[in-house]
Amino acid sequence: RYQVFLLGGGYPVPAGDDSHTFNRSALFGKDGQILAKYDKIHLFDVDLPDGNLYKESSTILSGAEYPPVVDVPGLCKIGLSICYDVRFPELYRYLSSNGAELIMIPAAFTAFTGKDHWQILLQARAIENTAYVVAPAQTGIHYGRRQSHGHAMVIDPWGTVLSDAGKTQGAAIAPADKERVKKIREQMPSLK
C-alpha cells in the first residue's frame, strides 16, 4: 500500500532447540518480500560498572555468516548489522568493501553505555566507511532495572548527525543521497 522499504529487527527467530533463538534483522521490499536477513554475530555478554550483568548467549545463538549487502532498487546498497556489532569495526569494513552505501544498525543500547558510546560509535562507523548510518533504537525502561538509551539516529558519511529522535518514542528521519556518498569517497579515498 505505501510502497516503502522496512527494516525489522532485531527480533527472535527459533534456533532449532528449545532454549535459544537467533537475533535477526530483515530488510523488506516494497511488496513485502524479504530482500536480506542477518542473524547477529556478536553477542552482548558483559558485566557493566553500573551493576548490570548481561549474558545474551544464555538465550541467543550467534549467527554463522557475515551480514549481507543488498542493492535496493531506487535507493542504494544497504548493509545490515545489529546493536553490539557496532563495536566491531571489521564487520563494517566488510560491509563497505562489499559496496554498502547505507548501513542499518537497529539497537537496544543500555542507558549506561549509550550515554557515552552510542553516538560516537555510530559516527565512527559512518566516517570510517564513508556511508550513511541509520540506527533505529529502543527507548524506555524494561524489566524493572533495564533502561534503553534511545536516540535513534541518521548520520551522514561525513559523520554529521542528521536526525536524533532523543529519548522519547518517535522517528529519526533524514534524506540520504547516493551522490553525497560518492563525492565524499572521492574526496576522502580511505576505502581504497
Predicted regions and their residues:
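Short beta-strand scaffold segments in enzyme catalytic cores
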Residues: 10, 24-27, 68-70, 152-154, ...
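Histidine-centered beta-alpha loop that forms part of the nucleotide-sugar donor binding/catalytic region
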Residues: 11, 39, 138
